[in-house]
Amino acid sequence: MSSVQQQPPPPRRVTNVGSLLLTPQENESLFTFLGKKCVTMSSAVVQLYAADRNCMWSKKCSGVACLVKDNPQRSYFLRIFDIKDGKLLWEQELYNNFVYNSPRGYFHTFAGDTCQVALNFANEEEAKKFRKAVTDLLGRRQRKSEKRRDPPNGPNLPMATVDIKNPEITTNRFYGPQVNNISHTKEKKKGKAKKKRLTKADIGTPSNFQHIGHVGWDPNTGFDLNNLDPELKNLFDMCGISEAQLKDRETSKVIYDFIEKTGGVEAVKNELRRQAPPPPPPSRGGPPPPPPPPHNSGPPPPPARGRGAPPPPPSRAPTAAPPPPPPSRPSVAVPPPPPNRMYPPPPPALPSSAPSGPPPPPPSVLGVGPVAPPPPPPPPPPPGPPPPPGLPSDGDHQVPTTAGNKAALLDQIREGAQLKKVEQNSRPVSCSGRDALLDQIRQGIQLKSVADGQESTPPTPAPTSGIVGALMEVMQKRSKAIHSSDEDEDEDDEEDFEDDDEWED
């Protein structure tokens, strides 16, 4: 008997049915227009009419009407194709409670989505077969829906209501005297004897049981997007799950099963809260970010350091606080040299901004500007590198010509490799936050080097870890299973589709 029961599925497989008025080649072309996993259960040459507001029939198009079983959408459609151009002209889904009328043998009507629709058949034999295919399908769907609504155990039985009272909790049982305990236990036994014991006969059978969880998932319609929990929606967005997947019956069931296996909605939400990343730190460096803006807001050259305009620093040169603008202080021998020794690498930048008589000192100032605000401890530059010491000390008196300045600047640039040998320990300790920040910027060697691999690694573990990664893996397996199906699996899907026709409520 078991082998006999397993044989019914093969007859359920639907094959394409062509039109009697078309040639075999035209029918084959029609079948290719249906699409993947789509089968026409009946085909006929028709004219499509629609009723306008004046209740008059107006012709819309003509072509081949097909009763299409669309497996991907798990639904049935009436579609009209143009076999010459190979395109779809019109379609109407067979919705719930669809009514198909035939006032004439060749003229069939039904209610469309927007208006009353009619099919005018070119051949009455085709019209008869087409009507039979549609009515048989509607009858089968109606029987299945009624079968699902009726409970398997016959009529509904009223549920017996039983009042179960919780036993009273008294402290005498533990702390009272023995006499009270004995009397209390006797009264308790009498009370128990009076109560009627609950039996299976007193419990009614469940009826119209439907599992509607607070997840917002329904076996037939998928997830309810309007009432979906915000935290679950955030999880689905993180996993890249679309609304169409949440509404799909099979895909939504996979997601729902995953949530149940994980421990339910509350467990998933707790896991999400636990895995939520902490707020990012305000900044990576030690010095606060505010100091840089005021420093940059001052005059363009760093020497100003935001304390005042460029002109005042020259007058304050003897204080050694802002020695940067040495152009005005070339006569003073001590302040200019320290700037030269401190950081001459950036000289090329400032000479362009200060093309006055002594361009060499400004470049050196650019490098030292904020670094040497305290006293300039370093002694005058050694005579080793001729360009640097000569330029600041004798720049105003001995190098009036621009050609000499340019040559000195080039010499200083060439000797830049020697100037980089200044040890970091010899620099004065800066006391202000701004100076410390500038020190850190100039001392690029101390900055932590970040490898290229580290940049790409942080983002990867986050999305693929925990509950998010597990759900993404489930969805990837689901996607692979859908895209890797072959023709044999398609036929199995059709059988399941017939057995599991669940697109209606």
From Swiss-Prot:
Domain (CRIB) spans 203-216
Biased composition range(s): Acidic residues = 486-505
Q: Which residues are annotated as modified residue N-acetylserine in the UniProt record? A: S2
Phosphotyrosine, modified sites: Y256
* GO terms under cellular component: actin cap; actin cytoskeleton; cytoplasmic vesicle; cytosol; endocytic vesicle membrane; endoplasmic reticulum membrane; extracellular exosome; glutamatergic synapse
Residues of the WH2 domain: 405-422, 433-450
Keyword Repeat included in the entry's annotation? yes
Segments of this protein annotated with the region Disordered: 138-163, 184-205, 266-406, 476-505
Keyword annotations from UniProtKB, A to Z: Acetylation, Actin-binding, Cell cycle, Cell division, Cytoplasm, Cytoskeleton, Methylation, Mitosis, Nucleus, Phosphoprotein, Repeat, Transcription, Transcription regulation
Q: Where is the composition biased (Pro residues)?
A: 276-364, 371-391
Q: Which residues carry this modification: Omega-N-methylarginine?
A: R307
Named from the GO MF annotations, one term is:
actin binding
State whether keyword Phosphoprotein applies.
Answer: yes
Q: Where in the cell is it found?
A: Cytoplasm, Cytoskeleton; Nucleus; Cytoplasm
Task: State its role.
Answer: Regulates actin polymerization by stimulating the actin-nucleating activity of the Arp2/3 complex. Involved in various processes, such as mitosis and cytokinesis, via its role in the regulation of actin polymerization. Together with CDC42, involved in the extension and maintenance of the formation of thin, actin-rich surface projections called filopodia. In addition to its role in the cytoplasm, also plays a role in the nucleus by regulating gene transcription, probably by promoting nuclear actin polymerization.
**Full protein name:** Actin nucleation-promoting factor WASL
Source organism per entry reads: Homo sapiens
